[in-house]
Amino acid sequence: MRTIVRSQFCLIAVCLVLGWLAAQMFPVGQSGAQRPASPPTKEQPPKHANAPVFPMQARLGANIYLQTSGEYRACCQMIYRSAADRLTAIVAEQPKSEKPLAVVLDLDETVFDNSAFQTFLYRNNLEYTDELWSLYERDHARDVTLIPGAKAFLEKVHELGVTPVLLSNRLQLNQAGSLAALEHLGIKVGDPAKELFLKVSATESNKTARREQVAGMYNVVMFIGDNLRDFSEAEFAAKKPPQGAGLEWYVEEIRRRQTEADKAAEHWGRDWFILPNPVYGEWDKLVGPDPLSLMHPTTMKAPEVKPAQK
């Protein structure tokens, strides 16, 4: 069993590396040369205050990877298959409990594929804003598709007599839109008060209180998400950079989160399962003003260009 779990963990790690590599890609022109994102112009509005650090154009490679690659689909299918197999074993081994068993899942980029929202931003030359996202949550349920493997996993959860609890940072104000998306995708939700936990405030991103609420109602045996904060806040939430933070601060905070992820190794592939998301997440709060300085060093040097022979 340890060998199986260890191999599952290694496969998942490979998926996350693939996702990270995709996130490093920049738009590629017809000549194949990399181009940086264009500066804001009258036609291209400046980034909103609540927008992520990377501009949309710098995320293009990651979005293309998520929307078009078979590798991403294979990753998600593999992770959900591993989670289903592990849950089957947990249920078989689990002693009787007064509280019903539950699996806690995030929604966006864990169950819901929101590629349509990303496409909307690109086609309209827009950056992310909370207001645009709220409109998408509320009014565009039919644009939402499924993350590969999610529906089959949820069906297995029900088959095993376990309750899937959806814990998301979508707005409670837009609950009807989220329920409509779930219905559109054919995902069963019982009593929303017991199985769908959304955030009340637009500024609330910490899930700890809601996780504790769920733990009071259920015997939670598994968590699934696409962001480390879907598993624990204290260890994985990125700290806010102090004013004037330099490269050293960003490197230290990145290493802290990486170390915490390594410390949680006994959870990965056992009761915590994470899906790749190279488009957005806690990680992109720490890219700093010079992302290239955070990348692995290299000993390679560009070849010298020899002058043309006359």
Task: List each language-model region with its residue ranges.
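Bacterial N-terminal signal peptides
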Residues: C10-Q24
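Second-shell loop/turn segments in exported
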Residues: Y65-A74, R138-V144, V165-L171, V200-S201
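Conserved phosphoryl-transfer catalytic core
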Residues: L126-R138
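Non-catalytic pre-domain segments flanking phosphatase-related domains
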Residues: A23-L105, V287-K310
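Substrate-recognition element of Asp-dependent hydrolases with the DxDx(T/V) motif
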Residues: E109, A150-L182, D226
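C-terminal cap/substrate-recognition subdomain and adjoining C-terminal extension
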Residues: L171, Q175-K310
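Bacterial N-terminal signal peptides that target proteins for export
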Residues: R2-I12
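Asp-based phosphoryl-transfer active-site loop
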Residues: V103-D113
